[in-house]
Every structure is written in structure tokens, then in C-alpha cells.
Amino acid sequence: MEYKINPIYRRIMLKISGEALQGTENFGVDSSILDRMVLEIKELVNIGVQIGMIIGGGNLFRGSRLVQFGMNKVIGDHIGMLATIMNGLVMHNALHRVYVDSSVMSAIPLQGVCDNYNWMRAIDLLSNNKVVIFGAGTGNPFFTTDSAACLRGIEISANAVFKATKVDGVFAHDPIQYPNHNIALYEQLSYQDVLQRELKVMDLTAFALARDHNLPIHIFNINKVGALKRIIMGYREGTVITK
């Protein structure tokens, strides 16, 4: 595809689930997916797109499952935060291998492992074309990485949040639950549409943050090669949610 000259977004917050990194593996990281992701990120960095990133930890730890068997929710969330740091370090190393400068910032102190989160420092790094990977969520239990992505996106003045999923966007019904049905894909929605139709885009805390700060949300399929770049260059892909 021949792309338009200039990206429509100059600074983005990219949210990748741990599940997306896991790919077809039973646990951990699928190296082929990781390698493809970092090459796509490199391509965007090379055209001047500033990228903040948050990665979930579900490929390494699912606290919600252990809570059912008696684990304290706060402890489970703390372990989940550490899982996001682990994924962040994996991404940091993979970007380094393809000569993309990046920095990992943690919402909880991990001296000697990564930098402490500082929003002014993060903006400075982004402005100098470095990818910034935000780890440990918001640093507080009971908040999802979706909430962290919207919060950090607002703090760094991102133009939009991009949520990478395993489906092509937002559907009227879950296409994974109904694989043999012809379910309509919404190309564009308003925040109000999502609330009225009770569409499960992200948790309500995250969604309210984005809505209240007029932060567009793009939902797209991470397994669709080039999908992220197509959106950033102004082409229709996945679902966009705006006011």
C-alpha cells in the first residue's frame, strides 16, 4: 500500500495485552510476534511518531484466578504489576536489538532495574524520539492496565490511545464467543454509543478517563500486519471511539 505522506497522530499511547504477546504459546512470549511488533514500532519511530507503551501481564500471571482460591486481591495485583515490568523489559530488549532507543519507567520503585515514573521525564524522552514503556500499571491495586494506558496517555498529552487486541475492532457481540456468526464491526462510535450499547471496550474507569479528556481510542487487531501504521497514516482500520 502507498501511504499518505504525514501521520495524523504524532504521539500515541499503545496498549498491548500480555495475551497478545503470548500468541500461540501456552505461557510467556511468542518470539515471532514480538519480533514483528518491534519492527512495526521501528517503522513508526522512523517516520517521527512518538510512542508510549503499556503492556499487560496476563501471559505471565493472572491474579484474578488465584483470588478465587484465596489470594488477597492486593497481593495479586502487586504480582500482576511485576509481570508488566517483566514484559516491559522483554520489549525494551527486543527494541534494543533492532536499534530503537527505549526506556522502561515503573510506577513502583525498582532501583537498578528501571527508572521511576516521572511524567516530565517521559515527555522529554518521547520528544527525543525514544519509546517509553510504562510498567507496573498505575502503581495501585484495583486499577487495570487499560486504566493505566488512559491515565499515562493523558499525562504525556498523547493524541490517542491504541488498544491492540486479537480481534479486528469492536463488534456488536463478542466474535470469539460467536465464531460462526456474521457479526457487524463498528468502524466508528461515540463514547455515548459505547455506554448505551454496553459494549465492552475497556473497563469503565479507563473509558471514563478517555471520555472526560476527549482522548480518542482506537481498537485494532495486533495480528493484522501493518494495521497500526494504517490507522496512524489516516486509513480506516478497526474501530475508533471519539466524542
From Swiss-Prot:
It comes from the Bacteria. GO terms for biological process: 'de novo' CTP biosynthetic process; UDP biosynthetic process. ATP binds at residues 15-18, 58, 62, 165, 171, 174. One of its GO terms (molecular function) is ATP binding. Its EC number is 2.7.4.22. InterPro entries: AceGlu_kinase-like_sf, Asp/Glu/Uridylate_kinase, Uridylate_kinase, Uridylate_kinase_bac. Belongs to the UMP kinase family. Homohexamer. This is Uridylate kinase. It comes from Blochmanniella floridana. The lineage of its organism: Bacteria, Pseudomonadati, Pseudomonadota, Gammaproteobacteria, Enterobacterales. The gene is pyrH.
